[in-house]
Amino acid sequence: MRKQEILIIESRSDQDIYDGRCEGDTLKRVLQLQGVSAKSIEVVNEKMFIKALNIAKRENIKYIHISAHGFDEGFTLTDGDIVTWRDFDRLAWPILRGKCICFSSCSVGNGVAELFTLHKSFCNAIVAPTRNISWGEGLVAYSAFYHRTQSHEKSSSQNVKVMNHIVGAGTFKLIESPFISRTYTIGAFMNNIF
């Protein structure tokens, strides 16, 4: 079994759970079709969120994908607790150092750069939406983003431009660390092309 390169952490609202809306498992299946190994974990509270973050310590995990309801100042867990950027720094520093974080959370791109004022090396880079996005927009845009990260010839800034071309100009933003802004190529070339 190949080592996981993407950790998907999802924290849905109670209404999302009731309605059967989720992103994590669907994105994991899309990634598997692309030859990328991912782990998807659903968390409902801060204790489970911390436990999931600790999985990111594995050196083969390069991308942390967080799917939760968000806003400029942070994001919300299933139990209703709000994780502000200061809280996230407290919970995730230095675990996410050297990783790339992708948020599928409404509007977090408008405030998440605060993490780099708390720690310049919090992570290598962040991709996040700057407006409210639908579940479908997030899934389609990130499916394209991760597909493109399989090529050494594509940069993260180019990949985010493609995401914006798909769902609308200015929707997603790449925020690079002032310390190290390296991103990663993932997966292996697919032998099973139909």
Each PLM stretch: what is its role?
Residues 1-59:
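A domain-level signal for caspase-like cysteine endopeptidase catalytic cores
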Residues 1-2, 55-60, 93-97, 120-121:
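Flexible, charged surface loops at secondary-structure boundaries
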Residues 6, 38-39, 101, 124, ...:
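Hydrophobic anchor at the start of a short beta-strand
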Residues 13-17, 46-48, 70-74, 107-110, ...:
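Short acidic, S/G/P-rich loop/turn micro-motifs used as interaction or catalytic elements
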Residues 53-88:
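A glycine-rich, hydrophobic loop/mini-helix early in the fold
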Residues 80-139:
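Catalytic cores of nucleophile-dependent amide-cleaving enzymes
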Residues 82-92, 152-194:
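Caspase-like cysteine protease fold
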